[in-house]
Amino acid sequence: MASARTLVLLLIGAVLMCQVSADSELLNEILAAHMEEDMPEKRCIDRYRSNICGSVIRPLDCTRRKSRMGRFARTNCKKLCGFC
């Protein structure tokens, strides 16, 4: 029963896609409305804030260029390092 429901939904979706692609004005209107929506910028967060960023990694580690800890800090603790 679930597969029949899925098949019906896919067929309805295909018919709607054919209708939209046949009417270029409608397609352009839909695309323009989608492009106008403001996408929120990705928030700057520290991935390992609860256990690593701030306790193991210090802001001084962000400036170390050749250490593994510095590379980890620059990649995963951007808020702590002030890169945001």
From Swiss-Prot:
Any one GO MF annotation of this record: toxin activity
GO CC, one annotated term: nematocyst
Disulfide-bond pairs as recorded: C44-C84, C53-C77, C62-C81
Annotated keywords: Cleavage on pair of basic residues, Disulfide bond, Nematocyst, Secreted, Signal, Toxin
Domain ShKT residues, every copy: 44-84
Major location (coarse): secreted
Cleaved propeptide residues: 23-41
Top-rank taxon: Eukaryota
Keyword set includes S-adenosyl-L-methionine: no
Localization (cell): Secreted; Nematocyst
Disulfide bond recorded as keyword: yes
Segment forming the signal sequence: 1-22
Protein family according to the UniProt entry: Belongs to the sea anemone 8 toxin family.
The protein, known as: U-actitoxin-Avd8e
